[in-house]
């Protein structure tokens, strides 16, 4: 794919509007993970160093569109940026019809406070475009949404280009999906086959080995004729699991950790017992890979040249159910393969064991990451490609 890049543009003295994904989790107004903001900061610094007058826009949360909601304000993000950059980053309210600011870097209040954002309204997008000489799309995490601040504005801005973060995401995913070094091992976890079926289909066509974890693995365990007790699985998708197994090499749990506790009783004091998948009882629930499966997956990763990871192998939020995910995560971190990881739960697992700097590329995208892996066109990237041809 060919898009214009921010690094190739003359930004000196220009008004540069940058769309970032600063949709961070908040707890009582306090940011609980700054990963997305930290990932965006190099782009902001690069634009400032190039002499640009920078305005940053983002969404946060799911407020009712067109209505101000203090709980969805980007004020905590502006405060964090100010602290991190050592300069005041003003938060600009009511900016859509133009604003005045002396600062070289401002944060525009939540784009979702503008009516028409979600429907990609042309009139709104034109107002956004009027605020800049150069529009920079740098929010991979929202690239799968055709909205005014991700797609529409790129249609109308004088210049529309990809920022360093977006470019790096596309480059990293391209290394996995276009011409990967082989063997390519894809690890897909999560709770349900149904929510990841298109991903499983897509990666089964390019991966040398497909490893499944979590509730997805449970459905495959059942497809092999095993009792799965009270485990989360999808009986109606057993034929799909069997089809995938016939299509490619699929690795799923042959031993598991189980508990007899109901999920409402799970705690950090819970206990899980390891056993063969063929020995699961009707009153037991699978919560993790068993040690043999985890070791087998780690060995597969050790021999890989490329690793794609999306989704945990068990209920890693509880330490008693986390061993499988930890073994796999550490194997990826220690591997010499090019590795890319994406998805919210995957990032949480990486954070849990502080492994981010040992993964080749950690994607900030959730839905966008999955849609790209599925081979879908991302609207925000497609419009940048169109503009690059013009």
Curated annotation (Swiss-Prot):
Q: Where are the transmembrane segments?
A: none
Which keywords has UniProt assigned to this entry?
Answer: ATP-binding, Cytoplasm, Glycolysis, Kinase, Nucleotide-binding, Transferase
Gene3D superfamilies hit by this protein: Phosphoglycerate kinase, N-terminal domain (3.40.50.1260)
Reactions performed catalytically: (2R)-3-phosphoglycerate + ATP = (2R)-3-phospho-glyceroyl phosphate + ADP
Query: Where's it found, cell-wise?
Result: Cytoplasm
Single Gene Ontology BP annotation:
gluconeogenesis
Q: Would you tell me the Gene Ontology cellular component terms? A: cytosol
- Tell me the SUPFAM superfamilies matching this sequence: Phosphoglycerate kinase
The residues the entry assigns to the signal sequence are none
Q: What is its main location?
A: cytoplasm
What name does this protein carry?
Phosphoglycerate kinase
Q: Which gene encodes it?
A: pgk
Query: Which pathway, per its entry?
Result: Carbohydrate degradation; glycolysis; pyruvate from D-glyceraldehyde 3-phosphate: step 2/5
Lineage at the top is:
Bacteria, Pseudomonadati, Pseudomonadota, Gammaproteobacteria, Cellvibrionales
Which InterPro entries did the record assign? Answer: Phosphoglycerate_kinase (IPR001576), Phosphoglycerate_kinase_CS (IPR015911), Phosphoglycerate_kinase_N (IPR015824), Phosphoglycerate_kinase_sf (IPR036043)
- Give EC number(s), comma-separated: 2.7.2.3
Its EC top class is transferase
UniProt-annotated binding residues for ATP: 196, 317, 343-346
Quaternary state and interactors:
Monomer.
- The organism encoding this protein is Cellvibrio japonicus (strain Ueda107)
Report a single Gene Ontology molecular function.
Answer: ATP binding
Q: A Pfam family name for this chain?
A: PGK
Q: Which domain of life is it from?
A: Bacteria
Q: Where along this sequence does the record place binding of substrate?
A: 21-23, 36, 59-62, 112, 145
Stated family: Belongs to the phosphoglycerate kinase family.
């Amino acid at each position: 794919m060919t898009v214009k890049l921010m690094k190739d543009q003359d930004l000196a003295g220009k008004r540069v509007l940058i769309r970032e994904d600063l949709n961070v989790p908040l707890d009582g107004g306090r940011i609980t993970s700054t990963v997305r903001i930290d990932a965006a900061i190099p782009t902001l610094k690069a634009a400032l160093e190039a002499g640009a007058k920078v305005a940053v826009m983002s969404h946060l949360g799911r407020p009712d569109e067109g209505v101000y909601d203090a709980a969805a304000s980007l004020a905590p993000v502006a405060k964090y940026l100010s602290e991190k950059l050592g300069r005041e980053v003003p938060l600009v309210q009511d900016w859509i019809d133009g604003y005045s600011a002396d600062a070289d870097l401002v944060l525009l209040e939540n784009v979702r406070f503008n009516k028409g954002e979600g429907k990609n309204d042309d009139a709104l997008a034109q107002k956004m475009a009027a605020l800049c000489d150069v529009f920079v799309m740098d929010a991979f995490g929202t690239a799968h949404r055709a909205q005014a601040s991700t797609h529409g504005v790129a249609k109308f801005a004088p210049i529309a280009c990809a920022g360093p973060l977006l470019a790096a995401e596309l480059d990293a995913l391209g290394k996995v999906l276009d011409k990967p070094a082989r063997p390519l091992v894809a690890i897909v976890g999560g709770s349900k086959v149904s929510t990841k079926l298109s991903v499983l289909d897509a990666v089964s066509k390019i991966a040398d080995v497909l490893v499944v974890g979590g509730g997805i693995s449970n459905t495959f365990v059942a497809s092999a004729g095993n009792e799965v007790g009270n485990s989360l699985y999808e009986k109606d998708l057993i034929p799909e699991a069997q089809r995938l197994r016939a299509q490619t090499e699929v690795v799923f749990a042959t031993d598991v950790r189980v508990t007899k506790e109901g999920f409402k009783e799970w705690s950090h004091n819970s206990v899980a017992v390891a056993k063969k998948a063929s020995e699961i009882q009707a009153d037991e629930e699978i919560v993790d890979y068993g040690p043999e499966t985890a070791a087998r997956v780690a060995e597969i990763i050790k021999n890989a040249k490329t690793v794609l990871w999306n989704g945990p192998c068990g209920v890693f939020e509880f330490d008693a159910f986390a061993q499988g995910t930890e073994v796999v995560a550490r194997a990826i971190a220690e591997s010499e393969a090019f590795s890319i990881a994406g998805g919210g739960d995957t990032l949480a697992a990486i954070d849990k064991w502080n492994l981010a700097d040992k993964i080749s590329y950690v994607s900030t995208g959730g839905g966008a990451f999955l849609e790209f892996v599925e081979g879908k066109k991302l609207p925000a990237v497609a419009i940048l490609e169109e503009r690059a041809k013009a």
